[in-house]
Amino acid sequence: MAGLYLHIPFCKQSCHYCNFHFSTSQNNRDEVLTAINKEINQKALGFNDKISTIYFGGGTPTILTEKELNTIIENILKKFDVEKNIEITVEANPDDLTKSKLSALSNSVVNRISIGVQSFIDKELKSMNRAHDSKKAIKSIEMARKYFENISIDILYGL
């Protein structure tokens, strides 16, 4: 059993707790997406394990357009041998989740969404420089439940 993790290094803003590689500038977006697809092509050569899970993390994968995300997914599905019931997860920020974004994700092969809530306490969210508040977090979870059966949320402890 093998899995793929793809790091999408773009964010709208910098969250104070985050130590992952990301950029709030998207000046090189096309080049980065081209490089991701080239790396997929390279890694697939001679890779014989069957892929059971694909995880898009970040950064913020939902910053990508439907076309950009689907291009990457289609490339993976063409280049790698994947399980029939593969789990494909996309991380999302609550402020990115609209009905149209959730609909597009659920109509693709994405079958799990992981929402970066981090906290339901507005004071903590503000201190982390998160773009959403607790009401938006709850609303995003409620909306996601209409489109996905498999949902997880990230919560930071001990803030």
PLM regions with names:
Residues M1-E31, K126:
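Canonical Radical SAM [4Fe-4S] cluster-binding loop centered on the CxxxCxxC motif
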Residues F22-G46, I51-L159:
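Conserved non-cysteine loop/helix-boundary elements of the Radical SAM core domain that shape
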